[in-house]
Amino acid sequence: MARRKSRILAFQALYAWDAGMKDTDDLLSLQWASAEQLERIGEDGRAFARLIVSGTLSQIEQIDGAIKERLVNWEIERLNKVGLAVLRMSVYSLMFQKDIHPSIIIDEAVDISREYGDEQSYRFINGILGAVKTDLDKGILVVREGSAGQ
């Protein structure tokens, strides 16, 4: 549950970044979050949220490329910002956080999109993340190693 709250914090940060509301330093400071939210997740949770945000932003081109390649008759620019933030952080986790089981990453993404997205977004997110996982497993999607925020 603690990691879920950290993922929600990371999702909120990535949403704010995409909406142009915060720059990277502001996001990583987490000063924009409520004191209650920060207290609930503790220092380990804050570190995990920062890792997801910094890693996602450092690999944004590779992550967006992976998402774009799996969109059928759709453009990434047309995705709603909630869904895009959830997809970005989850694709980052699938590609770079190998210590976390993919089913946990996908389940958390679906739950967060159900809570914050529209009625249909969780199905779409589940499909895209399932395709990313499958393509990673088959070696179709190859991760370019580099600074992944780890």
Q: In which residue ranges do the predicted regions lie?
A:
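N-terminal interaction/assembly modules
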Residues: M1-Y122, N126-Q150
